[in-house]
Amino acid sequence: MAGFLRDTADAWEAKIDDWLYVTDGAWARDAGASGYYIRVAPPVAGEARAATHAMVEVRNRDLCNADIPADALVSTDTLALVRFGLRAPDDPRIVDSVRVIDHVLRQELPTGPGWRRYNGDGYGEHADGSPFNGTGIGRVWPLLAGERAHYELLAGRKAEATRLLAVMEASGS
């Protein structure tokens, strides 16, 4: 059983780029990157890359805007590929993905940089301040500064990781 699971994990790892890396997305052009990892691709029969252009339902968005093209959905989840040892922090695909993440999701706050989970996130209160009821507006998550600090540390940038730790601490209430 262990061999089967190891072989399956190796096969999946070998397909990550086919399943989730796009080189023709608008965000790459906008950020000056060669490509980026997308948040999720729906199961599509046939060619794996076809899924990167399929529609994905984001359930915490209002029904009129719930569907978004997979290649338009950028997420900080990409950093997990480095944290889990599946990609090196200096892998050009990771470096370009971080460039896109910063272009799309980074927001400068009084405490320092912050990141939203993904573009179009609807988890949060509404624009008028009313509470989340299944849809809303996604905001910056202080915890994501800590996740970015992990990446910076693995990339050998201890000073930046320490700065991001201070950003996360300053964001607490």
List each language-model region with its residue ranges:
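Extended ligand-binding clefts on enzyme/binding-domain cores
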Residues: 2-142, 156
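C-terminal hydrophobic structural anchor segments
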Residues: 129-173
